[in-house]
């Protein structure tokens, strides 16, 4: 059975540059790692009170975003854009102690 994680990125588009918005949009969609049986659904919006995450940092040069949950700000998630079909996701602590190995996700069509 697949583990499914919903990530609702909450941000104010009026405070972001066009390049930052484009960078975020690279990650929007449904992604899966078949080997680990994990799927993630990344979207923009605050139309739900569940699974809300706020963006901490947008690195447009490396196509990377860092974000954390409204419920647990101690865990930081890092998304790296690999290509149109793959992203990498890893976690870290807010204190920077330890970082998980990146998990590769493939875009679901």
Swiss-Prot record:
Signal peptide: none
Residue ranges, annotated region (Binds to staphopain B): 97-101
Gene3D superfamilies named among the record's database cross-references: beta-Barrel protease inhibitors
Cellular-component GO terms for this entry: cytoplasm
Pfam families: Staphostatin_B
Keyword Chloroplast: no
Transmembrane segments: none
Tagged with keyword Cytoplasm: yes
Similarity comment: Belongs to the protease inhibitor I57 (SspC) family.
Note from the entry: Inactivated by staphylococcal serine protease (SspA).
Protein name: Staphostatin B
Source organism of this protein record: Staphylococcus aureus (strain MRSA252)
